[in-house]
């Protein structure tokens, strides 16, 4: 199941605005940019996985794992624009490892509205 269109960031102008005005947090596997957006009452997600990470199958696997993590925590995420950039070490991780690493960096970025186990 996909995230609905309202939850996606697709336009380059939106990505550039978040890169410039947003706050970034990183760990070895991911960089997360967050930016407040008062126009909406839910989060929006943009995902960037470079071609340097591998072929399309691998890049799509990483993107699916990231989207799945956001779907699981959908009700606990604050209304912000969020961009997740996958780094090189993410290509060697399992889906569970991606989930744990992403949750770790999202907690640091303070995008959850309450404690997540």
From Swiss-Prot:
PROSITE patterns: RIBONUCLEASE_P. One of its GO terms (cellular component) is ribonuclease P complex. The keyword Protein biosynthesis does not apply. Coiled coil: none annotated. GO terms for molecular function: 3'-tRNA processing endoribonuclease activity; ribonuclease P activity; tRNA binding. Keywords: Endonuclease, Hydrolase, Nuclease, RNA-binding, tRNA processing. HAMAP family: RNase_P (MF_00227). PANTHER family: RIBONUCLEASE P PROTEIN COMPONENT. This is Ribonuclease P protein component.
């Amino acid at each position: 199941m996909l995230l609905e269109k309202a939850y996606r960031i697709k336009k380059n102008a939106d990505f550039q605005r978040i890169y410039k005005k947003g706050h970034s947090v990183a760990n070895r596997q991911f960089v997360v940019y967050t930016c407040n957006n008062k126009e909406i009452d839910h989060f929006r997600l943009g995902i960037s996985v470079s071609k340097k990470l591998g072929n399309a199958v691998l890049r799509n696997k990483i993107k699916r794992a990231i989207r799945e993590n956001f779907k699981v925590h959908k009700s606990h995420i604050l209304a912000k624009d969020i961009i997740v950039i996958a780094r090189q070490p993410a290509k060697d991780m399992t889906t569970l490892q991606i989930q744990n690493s992403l949750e770790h960096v999202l907690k640091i970025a303070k995008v959850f509205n309450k404690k997540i186990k």
